[in-house]
């Protein structure tokens, strides 16, 4: 996920409501809408020709963008007292810069007050989705879900923006 793409494409033509409803769910990870839980397995593999062309352009810049994300990640890891989920990896794409703290909510509020976005990914673990309930419990994954958050790490960030994030990621 280090090269962005936009939009989606493809079409299914049918006058059968049941088929149309199922096709809509299959194209969105088995969900009716993005805010709902999966009710059966599905995919998200939609890509138009235009998206493909944009990705090809992105490939020309991917090494440069990767170096910039690595530089930003190194700086923010150095400035932050919080554990970084990627701190022990020699090579990482840094498509997401994940920090961990039991004080996640407080940290996110502080970042928000200073105009810095932070995100919690994977609020609902796959084994908690209605479709997969009743299987294994994953206590380590659950704990990581509760303490992990990401901060901006796009290659487009200016040095001043990176310093601003580093100043408030404390």
Q: Residue spans of the language-model regions?
A:
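PLP-dependent aminotransferase class I/II
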Residues: 15-170
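Glycine-rich phosphate-binding loop of ATP-grasp-fold ATP-dependent ligases
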Residues: 2, 6-12
């Amino acid at each position: 996920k280090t090269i962005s793409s936009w939009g989606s494409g493809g079409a299914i033509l049918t006058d059968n409501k049941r088929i149309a409803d199922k096709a809509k769910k299959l194209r969105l990870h088995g969900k009716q809408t993005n805010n709902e839980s999966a009710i059966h397995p599905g995919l998200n593999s939609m890509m138009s020709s235009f998206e493909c062309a944009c990705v090809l352009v992105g490939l020309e810049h991917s090494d440069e963008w990767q170096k910039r994300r690595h530089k930003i990640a190194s700086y923010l890891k150095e400035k932050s007292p919080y554990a970084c989920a990627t701190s022990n990896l020699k090579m990482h794409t840094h498509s997401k810069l994940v920090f961990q703290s039991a004080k996640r909510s407080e940290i996110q509020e502080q970042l928000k007050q200073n105009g810095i976005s932070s995100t919690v990914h994977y609020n609902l673990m796959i084994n908690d989705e209605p479709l997969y309930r009743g299987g294994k419990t994953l206590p380590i994954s659950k704990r990581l879900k509760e303490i992990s958050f990401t901060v901006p790490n796009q290659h487009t960030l200016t040095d001043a923006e990176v310093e601003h994030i580093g100043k408030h990621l404390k």
